[in-house]
Protein backbone atom coordinates (compact mmCIF):
# COMPACT_ATOMS: atom_id res chain seq x y z
CA UNK A 1 0.00 0.00 0.00
CA UNK A 2 1.28 3.46 -0.93
CA UNK A 3 0.07 6.58 0.92
CA UNK A 4 1.14 10.09 0.08
CA UNK A 5 0.61 13.20 2.27
CA UNK A 6 1.61 16.74 1.30
CA UNK A 7 0.81 20.35 2.23
CA UNK A 8 0.22 22.87 -0.47
CA UNK A 9 0.85 25.93 1.71
CA UNK A 10 0.52 29.19 -0.22
CA UNK A 11 -0.26 27.30 -3.46
CA UNK A 12 -3.64 26.10 -2.15
CA UNK A 13 -5.64 28.66 -4.16
CA UNK A 14 -4.21 27.35 -7.46
CA UNK A 15 -4.07 23.58 -6.72
CA UNK A 16 -6.83 20.96 -6.77
CA UNK A 17 -6.81 17.27 -5.75
CA UNK A 18 -8.06 14.47 -8.01
CA UNK A 19 -8.05 10.71 -7.64
CA UNK A 20 -8.52 7.89 -10.17
CA UNK A 21 -9.22 4.23 -9.44
CA UNK A 22 -7.24 1.55 -11.38
CA UNK A 23 -8.16 -2.12 -11.26
CA UNK A 24 -5.49 -4.27 -9.73
CA UNK A 25 -4.57 -6.53 -6.93
CA UNK A 26 -3.63 -3.68 -4.67
CA UNK A 27 -6.01 -1.76 -2.49
CA UNK A 28 -7.37 1.27 -4.32
CA UNK A 29 -6.16 4.67 -3.25
CA UNK A 30 -9.72 5.98 -3.03
CA UNK A 31 -12.54 3.62 -2.13
CA UNK A 32 -15.60 3.46 -4.28
CA UNK A 33 -18.65 5.31 -3.14
CA UNK A 34 -21.25 3.07 -1.60
CA UNK A 35 -24.85 4.14 -1.87
CA UNK A 36 -26.26 5.06 1.48
CA UNK A 37 -28.79 2.74 2.94
CA UNK A 38 -31.94 4.08 4.55
CA UNK A 39 -30.57 3.12 7.94
CA UNK A 40 -27.47 5.39 7.50
CA UNK A 41 -27.81 9.19 7.95
CA UNK A 42 -27.83 11.21 4.76
CA UNK A 43 -25.61 14.28 4.60
CA UNK A 44 -27.26 17.64 4.03
CA UNK A 45 -25.97 18.42 0.53
CA UNK A 46 -27.48 21.93 0.58
CA UNK A 47 -25.11 22.93 3.33
CA UNK A 48 -21.64 23.76 1.93
CA UNK A 49 -18.83 21.61 3.14
CA UNK A 50 -16.14 23.87 4.58
CA UNK A 51 -12.68 22.80 3.54
CA UNK A 52 -9.51 24.41 2.27
CA UNK A 53 -10.46 23.73 -1.32
CA UNK A 54 -14.01 25.12 -0.98
CA UNK A 55 -12.81 28.22 0.80
CA UNK A 56 -10.07 28.80 -1.75
CA UNK A 57 -12.68 28.78 -4.46
CA UNK A 58 -14.45 31.69 -2.81
CA UNK A 59 -11.30 33.81 -2.63
CA UNK A 60 -11.06 36.91 -4.78
CA UNK A 61 -9.13 36.28 -7.99
CA UNK A 62 -8.23 39.81 -9.02
CA UNK A 63 -4.86 41.08 -10.18
CA UNK A 64 -2.46 41.10 -7.28
CA UNK A 65 -0.23 44.05 -6.50
CA UNK A 66 2.07 42.01 -4.28
CA UNK A 67 2.57 38.23 -4.09
CA UNK A 68 4.22 36.05 -1.49
CA UNK A 69 7.10 33.63 -1.54
CA UNK A 70 7.42 30.09 -0.26
CA UNK A 71 8.94 30.96 3.09
CA UNK A 72 6.96 34.09 4.04
CA UNK A 73 3.45 34.49 5.51
CA UNK A 74 0.67 34.62 2.99
CA UNK A 75 -0.73 38.13 2.34
CA UNK A 76 -2.61 39.75 -0.48
CA UNK A 77 -2.74 43.49 -1.23
CA UNK A 78 -5.25 44.71 -3.78
CA UNK A 79 -5.03 47.93 -5.77
CA UNK A 80 -7.72 50.49 -4.85
CA UNK A 81 -8.53 52.75 -7.76
CA UNK A 82 -11.50 54.45 -6.07
CA UNK A 83 -9.43 56.30 -3.44
CA UNK A 84 -9.43 60.08 -4.01
CA UNK A 85 -6.08 61.74 -3.54
CA UNK A 86 -6.42 64.93 -1.43
CA UNK A 87 -6.02 68.15 -3.40
CA UNK A 88 -5.31 71.37 -1.54
CA UNK A 89 -5.13 73.63 -4.56
CA UNK A 90 -8.12 75.64 -3.36
CA UNK A 91 -6.22 76.62 -0.23
CA UNK A 92 -2.95 77.47 -1.92
CA UNK A 93 -2.00 80.81 -3.39
CA UNK A 94 -1.95 81.25 -7.13
CA UNK A 95 1.76 82.09 -7.09
CA UNK A 96 2.74 78.66 -5.74
CA UNK A 97 0.33 76.38 -7.60
CA UNK A 98 2.86 75.58 -10.29
CA UNK A 99 5.35 73.10 -8.84
CA UNK A 100 7.80 73.72 -11.66
CA UNK A 101 8.40 77.34 -10.63
CA UNK A 102 10.56 78.49 -7.75
CA UNK A 103 8.74 80.07 -4.82
CA UNK A 104 11.42 82.75 -4.59
CA UNK A 105 9.98 84.51 -7.62
CA UNK A 106 6.75 85.30 -5.76
CA UNK A 107 8.15 85.64 -2.24
CA UNK A 108 8.07 89.45 -2.26
CA UNK A 109 4.41 89.59 -3.28
CA UNK A 110 3.43 86.98 -0.71
CA UNK A 111 5.37 88.74 2.05
CA UNK A 112 3.76 92.05 1.15
CA UNK A 113 0.31 90.52 1.38
CA UNK A 114 1.15 88.95 4.75
CA UNK A 115 2.46 92.28 6.07
CA UNK A 116 -0.68 94.04 4.85
CA UNK A 117 -2.98 91.57 6.59
CA UNK A 118 -0.91 91.77 9.78
CA UNK A 119 -0.95 95.57 9.75
CA UNK A 120 -4.69 95.81 9.17
CA UNK A 121 -5.35 93.26 11.92
CA UNK A 122 -3.09 95.12 14.35
CA UNK A 123 -4.82 98.44 13.68
CA UNK A 124 -8.24 96.83 14.14
CA UNK A 125 -7.25 95.17 17.41
CA UNK A 126 -5.71 98.41 18.71
CA UNK A 127 -8.85 100.38 17.84
CA UNK A 128 -11.07 97.81 19.55
CA UNK A 129 -8.80 97.78 22.61
CA UNK A 130 -8.92 101.58 22.74
CA UNK A 131 -12.71 101.54 22.78
CA UNK A 132 -12.77 98.92 25.52
CA UNK A 133 -10.30 100.87 27.67
CA UNK A 134 -12.19 104.13 27.07
CA UNK A 135 -15.50 102.59 28.13
CA UNK A 136 -13.87 101.01 31.18
CA UNK A 137 -12.29 104.30 32.28
CA UNK A 138 -15.53 106.18 31.59
CA UNK A 139 -17.45 103.74 33.77
CA UNK A 140 -15.21 104.66 36.72
CA UNK A 141 -15.63 108.41 36.25
CA UNK A 142 -18.13 110.46 38.20
CA UNK A 143 -21.75 110.38 37.12
CA UNK A 144 -23.74 113.41 35.99
CA UNK A 145 -25.31 114.03 39.38
CA UNK A 146 -21.92 113.86 41.08
CA UNK A 147 -20.44 116.28 38.55
CA UNK A 148 -23.34 118.62 39.16
CA UNK A 149 -22.42 118.73 42.85
CA UNK A 150 -18.74 119.18 42.05
CA UNK A 151 -19.29 122.87 41.28
CA UNK A 152 -21.20 125.49 43.17
CA UNK A 153 -22.23 128.99 42.12
CA UNK A 154 -22.18 131.69 44.76
CA UNK A 155 -23.77 135.11 44.44
CA UNK A 156 -21.36 137.55 46.05
CA UNK A 157 -23.88 140.33 46.56
CA UNK A 158 -25.55 138.23 49.25
CA UNK A 159 -22.44 138.46 51.48
CA UNK A 160 -22.06 141.82 53.25
CA UNK A 161 -18.65 143.39 53.82
CA UNK A 162 -16.83 142.10 56.88
CA UNK A 163 -18.93 138.94 57.08
CA UNK A 164 -18.24 135.27 56.39
CA UNK A 165 -20.76 132.87 54.86
CA UNK A 166 -20.52 129.08 54.96
CA UNK A 167 -21.65 126.81 52.11
CA UNK A 168 -21.63 123.04 51.66
CA UNK A 169 -19.42 121.90 48.78
CA UNK A 170 -18.50 118.24 48.09
CA UNK A 171 -19.54 117.35 51.62
CA UNK A 172 -17.21 119.95 53.17
CA UNK A 173 -17.82 123.43 54.61
CA UNK A 174 -16.80 126.24 52.28
CA UNK A 175 -15.92 129.67 53.73
CA UNK A 176 -16.49 132.78 51.59
CA UNK A 177 -15.33 135.95 53.37
CA UNK A 178 -15.94 139.52 52.25
CA UNK A 179 -12.99 141.38 53.75
CA UNK A 180 -12.84 145.02 54.63
CA UNK A 181 -10.09 147.34 53.43
CA UNK A 182 -8.55 147.27 56.89
CA UNK A 183 -8.32 143.45 56.85
CA UNK A 184 -6.78 143.54 53.39
CA UNK A 185 -4.04 145.97 54.46
CA UNK A 186 -3.46 144.12 57.72
CA UNK A 187 -2.95 140.71 56.09
CA UNK A 188 -0.78 142.13 53.30
CA UNK A 189 1.60 143.65 55.87
CA UNK A 190 2.34 140.35 57.65
CA UNK A 191 6.00 139.26 57.37
CA UNK A 192 6.48 135.79 55.92
CA UNK A 193 9.09 135.03 58.57
CA UNK A 194 6.35 135.12 61.19
CA UNK A 195 4.33 132.40 59.49
CA UNK A 196 4.56 128.67 60.11
CA UNK A 197 3.44 127.96 56.55
CA UNK A 198 4.85 130.99 54.67
CA UNK A 199 2.49 132.27 52.00
CA UNK A 200 1.71 135.83 50.96
CA UNK A 201 -1.86 137.06 51.09
CA UNK A 202 -1.90 137.95 47.39
CA UNK A 203 -0.95 134.34 46.54
CA UNK A 204 -4.10 133.06 48.24
CA UNK A 205 -6.69 135.35 46.67
CA UNK A 206 -7.68 136.43 43.16
CA UNK A 207 -9.48 139.52 44.39
CA UNK A 208 -8.23 141.09 47.63
CA UNK A 209 -11.72 141.64 49.04
CA UNK A 210 -12.77 138.00 48.63
CA UNK A 211 -11.25 135.05 50.48
CA UNK A 212 -12.53 131.55 49.62
CA UNK A 213 -11.36 128.67 51.86
CA UNK A 214 -12.24 125.07 52.72
CA UNK A 215 -13.40 125.16 56.33
CA UNK A 216 -11.51 122.11 57.58
CA UNK A 217 -8.73 122.49 60.13
CA UNK A 218 -5.42 121.08 58.90
CA UNK A 219 -4.72 119.55 62.30
CA UNK A 220 -7.40 116.88 62.79
CA UNK A 221 -10.19 117.97 60.45
CA UNK A 222 -12.41 120.01 62.76
CA UNK A 223 -14.48 122.95 61.49
CA UNK A 224 -13.10 126.31 62.64
CA UNK A 225 -15.29 129.21 63.82
CA UNK A 226 -15.28 132.32 61.63
CA UNK A 227 -14.53 135.82 62.96
CA UNK A 228 -12.92 134.37 66.10
CA UNK A 229 -9.47 133.79 67.53
CA UNK A 230 -6.54 136.03 68.41
CA UNK A 231 -6.04 137.19 64.83
CA UNK A 232 -9.64 137.93 63.90
CA UNK A 233 -9.88 135.22 61.29
CA UNK A 234 -10.80 131.65 62.21
CA UNK A 235 -10.48 129.63 65.40
CA UNK A 236 -10.61 125.83 65.81
CA UNK A 237 -12.17 124.97 69.18
CA UNK A 238 -10.93 121.36 69.12
CA UNK A 239 -7.26 122.04 69.86
CA UNK A 240 -6.93 125.82 69.73
CA UNK A 241 -5.56 126.57 66.27
CA UNK A 242 -5.75 130.28 65.27
CA UNK A 243 -5.93 131.46 61.66
CA UNK A 244 -5.87 135.02 60.34
CA UNK A 245 -8.31 136.61 57.88
CA UNK A 246 -6.37 135.07 55.00
CA UNK A 247 -6.70 131.54 56.41
CA UNK A 248 -3.02 131.25 57.39
CA UNK A 249 -2.07 129.38 60.57
CA UNK A 250 -0.71 131.75 63.20
CA UNK A 251 -0.99 129.84 66.48
CA UNK A 252 -1.80 126.32 67.64
CA UNK A 253 -1.00 122.75 66.56
CA UNK A 254 -2.23 123.00 62.95
CA UNK A 255 0.75 122.54 60.61
CA UNK A 256 -0.62 124.13 57.42
CA UNK A 257 -2.82 126.96 56.22
CA UNK A 258 -6.46 126.42 55.33
CA UNK A 259 -6.82 124.98 51.83
CA UNK A 260 -7.82 127.27 48.97
CA UNK A 261 -10.07 125.51 46.42
CA UNK A 262 -10.15 126.11 42.69
CA UNK A 263 -12.57 128.87 41.81
CA UNK A 264 -13.28 131.36 39.07
CA UNK A 265 -15.06 134.70 38.94
CA UNK A 266 -17.54 134.61 36.06
CA UNK A 267 -18.70 138.16 36.76
CA UNK A 268 -18.35 140.84 39.40
CA UNK A 269 -21.24 139.31 41.30
CA UNK A 270 -20.77 135.55 40.64
CA UNK A 271 -18.08 132.99 41.48
CA UNK A 272 -17.96 129.28 40.61
CA UNK A 273 -16.07 126.99 42.96
CA UNK A 274 -14.82 123.69 41.55
UniProtKB/Swiss-Prot annotation:
It is a single-pass membrane protein. Keywords: 2Fe-2S, Disulfide bond, Electron transport, Iron, Iron-sulfur, Membrane, Metal-binding, Mitochondrion, Mitochondrion inner membrane, Respiratory chain, Transit peptide, Translocase, Transmembrane, Transmembrane helix, Transport. The chain crosses the membrane at residues 104-140. Signal peptide: none annotated. The keyword S-adenosyl-L-methionine does not apply. PROSITE patterns: RIESKE. One of its GO terms (molecular function) is 2 iron, 2 sulfur cluster binding. Its cofactor is [2Fe-2S] cluster. Proteolytic processing is necessary for the correct insertion of UQCRFS1 in the complex III dimer. Several fragments are generated during UQCRFS1 insertion, most probably due to the endogenous matrix-processing peptidase (MPP) activity of the 2 core protein subunits UQCRC1/QCR1 and UQCRC2/QCR2, which are homologous to the 2 mitochondrial-processing peptidase (MPP) subunits beta-MPP and alpha-MPP respectively. The action of the protease is also necessary for the clearance of the UQCRFS1 fragments. Residues 141-274 are mitochondrial intermembrane. The keyword Acetylation does not apply. GO terms for biological process: respiratory electron transport chain. It is found in: Mitochondrion inner membrane. InterPro entries: bc1_Rieske_TM_sf, Globular_prot_asu/bsu, Rieske_2Fe-2S, Rieske_2Fe-2S_sf, Rieske_Fe-S_prot, Rieske_Fe-S_prot_C, Rieske_TM, Ubiquinol_cyt_c_Rdtase_Fe-S-su. Residues 79-103 are mitochondrial matrix. Its EC number is 7.1.1.8. [2Fe-2S] cluster binds at residues 217, 219, 236, 239, 241. Binds 1 [2Fe-2S] cluster per subunit. Fe-S cluster delivery to the Rieske protein is mediated by components of the iron sulfur (Fe-S) cluster assembly machinery that reside in the mitochondrial matrix (including HSC20 and LYRM7). Belongs to the Rieske iron-sulfur protein family. NCBIfam families: Rieske_proteo. This is Cytochrome b-c1 complex subunit Rieske, mitochondrial. It comes from Pongo pygmaeus.
Amino acid sequence: MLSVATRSGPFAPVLSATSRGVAGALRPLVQATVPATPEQPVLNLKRPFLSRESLSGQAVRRPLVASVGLNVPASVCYSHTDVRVPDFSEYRRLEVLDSTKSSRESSEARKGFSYLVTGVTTVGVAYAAKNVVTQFVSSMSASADVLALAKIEIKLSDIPEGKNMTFKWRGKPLFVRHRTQKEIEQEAAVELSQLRDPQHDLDRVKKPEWVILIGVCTHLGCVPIANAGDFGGYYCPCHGSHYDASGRIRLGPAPLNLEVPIYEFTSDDMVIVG
